[in-house]
């Protein structure tokens, strides 16, 4: 779900060059423009995308020497501002584009919140970018620089983007030279110099910033070189940082990042959820979310773990994940809070562990953050409510005890103690604090002593065994309370885990039973709606276009122009956008692309930018999206595999067809040409009988060719999806007469008999096709039986509404194995009775008959003849509706 991954959009990613300086005024833009002019004079296609408007004549003069890409304007208040036109840069696609002020925050947030995101999109389209940056705008250094200078920097660039730069060029001048430039008014107007010199631009600050810049760039280049040479090294230290809702946690994360960078370690951010339900916990979730996003932007892998206490969860996770160093923030001492709660560091140190613990001191936290931090507010309201619950249960126990005591003053002590123990159990279930159970256990003893032991209504004790009873009672109550709290917590964890497991199981089950991308997206949308309780719209994508919009829960999708732009951007860049992201943050939908390049769909979740997904739901959603993407790719791959198999089958069929037809056409043509050649060359030397034999043989070969071509043309015509056949009423007796005429012409009357018990009956058929089907069946019987085998064409009523046509022979029949294949195209069978002067069938006859009959809503069937032989038959309805099929 990371928004920081670069995507391949069909082009190689462009090269990023950053001109970095330690302060405004060192000459970054001037240096960038000077180098650009040299490249332009060398015929490099280089253009200015955006240069910050300057009061410096030298910089403006350089900018005039380069071609510019037109910028856009936006109105903010009563002022108009220029801003980068990303689409125009991508459209013009120069080799190199110059873009000033990398850390700038866009005034118009219609597309990206930050300029570095604009640059990242341009890089992804294969365009090289040269840009400028001051050291104080690097995310991980901002807190450190704030400590140095006292100036809080709001515009920041994440470290991963700086580390992705191909070239880091330091623009450096001495602090003395910079101060001279400032005094000369070359950086700021002279009326602003007093403020500048009193805050940021002091010699001490500039010297520290210069040193930090040189060291940071050197470290970055060194780190890149080490990564390049040690890329295959698997043994790396593992640095973990504890995430919390504390305002100090931001600086702790940045310090942990620096440590991980220096040690070239695996970096993980770990958040321990202890299932608090109070308002303070809910309010901290937004801060936790921001810290998790910060850790992600610094390259950390984020983990959410559930535990009874933060210390226990951290310790168990660090041991299981082979963490070498755990980074936590310094504990802020508070005597009242520490009296009831063990500080995290003390709790961690009580465990046996092999990892190191490093504490980031509070003095490293910027002064402004300390001042803005809200004071610690103890959980007084919740504690007061729990105290009232304890008092109520105590009163109930006393009232019940007094009633039982009145019934039996001598034997009621045990029962009354049990009532107080039950009160402890109820209190442990009803309240959250362990302290309440502890206090109740002690108070119970004093209440019991006061009301139910002699002398009553005093705290004096006469019997020597009562102190022991009281101690045992206290210990029993405390242990019972502790065990119940533990069981209650385990129940909460189990309930959460069961909810997660059940939700993921339902999700996996729903997508496993789905075999289309559209249905996968719909099922996933309903499951995610159940998780987040937000309306969802599905966009099905094909060939980079939205082909279908499916709103769920009867949700009306009011798509604005900005929504359309965001959708197009997500399709093009294959990254998340909208609410909860920094791209198109103004729209009220969170757009999540599904599937790898190209994406197959988009889930649009209704969300406001102010809303935050808690870490628990975020982890479930991430699992769901990963499973969905995998399922979509599997379905797509399965579809592609099926299409490939069908294509291969078509190619094989086509190849078999060409091979078969070339043989079947070439052989009779060769015979005909040979016979005619003999007649032309040797006609004078041949008798009339010999000439007739050659002519008859040539005629038979021509008939075979005619039948072959007719079958192929008919089959091709019938298989065409837009071909219709014309059904007309036709007398069965006329059909019989035409069959007799064909048999007469083919000299088959002696072998084939036609028996019909149907005469004056109309059937609705395409007569030419049915005649062709019947003749193919007769031809098939002739080819597959011996010359003395009788063949019968039977026409009779199969029922009141159907007439059966059957071709019956007394040949060898067809084996069970071959019966499964006889209607397949190009299947020729054993051809046991073919003679030398007969042509082997092409295997299309029965297939063509079946195709013709399907057009008549009928079906060719086979059954064995008794005692031997074959019967091919089909039925035609007598009342079939006339019309086109």
From Swiss-Prot:
This is Sensor histidine kinase KdpD. Residues 660-880 form the Histidine kinase domain. Its EC number is 2.7.13.3. Coiled coil: none annotated. GO terms for molecular function: ATP binding; phosphorelay sensor kinase activity. It is a multi-pass membrane protein. Disruption phenotype: Inactivation of kdpD results in decreased transcript level of cap. Keywords: ATP-binding, Kinase, Membrane, Nucleotide-binding, Phosphoprotein, Transferase, Transmembrane, Transmembrane helix, Two-component regulatory system. It catalyses: ATP + protein L-histidine = ADP + protein N-phospho-L-histidine. The modification Phosphohistidine is found at residue 663. Cyclic di-AMP is a negative regulator of the Kdp system. GO terms for cellular component: plasma membrane. It comes from the Bacteria. It comes from Staphylococcus aureus (strain NCTC 8325 / PS 47). Member of the two-component regulatory system KdpD/KdpE that regulates the transcription of a series of virulence factors through sensing external K(+) concentrations. Also regulates capsular polysaccharide production. May function as a membrane-associated protein kinase that phosphorylates KdpE in response to environmental signals. In turn, KpdE functions as a transcriptional regulator by direct binding to promoter regions of target genes including spa, hla, aur and geh. InterPro entries: GAF-like_dom_sf, HATPase_C_sf, His_kinase_dom, HisK_dim/P_dom, HisK_dim/P_sf, Histidine_kinase_KdpD, KdpD_sf, KdpD_TM.
